[in-house]
């Protein structure tokens, strides 16, 4: 399976914004390994080719990757793989220096392209049981099906022929809470975007109304087993629509950062371990990495910890909200 994860994109976007702000603030040149400079040159060349192609975004959702974007992806992905191969054991020791102005302009260009890609991802959306892809909630994952390829004359370790992809189409997955959680970091809150996103998530398939918490994923019904081990679990258990406290806390933290204070305290009343009823099992406060959601077939243990991994719920709470 060829795939991509949007959460990493959102995090990279934030990192680049930070680097640009620091470069603009101090105006100092930056020295990088020559191997990284080579990759940067290839990435900028791919952007030059994309700009020269005259590519423009379509108003319609297109699942077949346009040839211009495929060429861009292929060039950048190859550059990344070449870089990793060269530095897997050591760097050469050679360096390249970028002045602040050049570096700032480069990063600004990268940010524009990433922003366009993030908007494209939201337009393509998610897809699953009861999800028509029009929720406007940022997706977390995509898969890519290779639609045409050419044999390159090479073979793998067991003698099977290898091929180079020439085109591909996009496959969608259900919503995961990590998508909007990471995306909220990128919002500068123009037009109350954070509040709008919060309302979308609250009314989506990610909400466990019985527990007033959030599933780690929406329904996985009908998904391919290529998704991995999460498909082996019954709904409401472990990785299949259970409650992941560490991801929920990250989501609540973004509500705070977005100045959604009323929404934050409302969610914490249902999702914070500090508000667990005293009569509840001690396990709910001790080993609370994952909880059984309202979808689990045994209703008597809804909201109870799975005890699969031993993370302290209170440590998650303290780490996220008391020392951040």
What are these regions (language model features)?
Residues 1-324:
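Acidic, mature catalytic/reactive cores of soluble proteins
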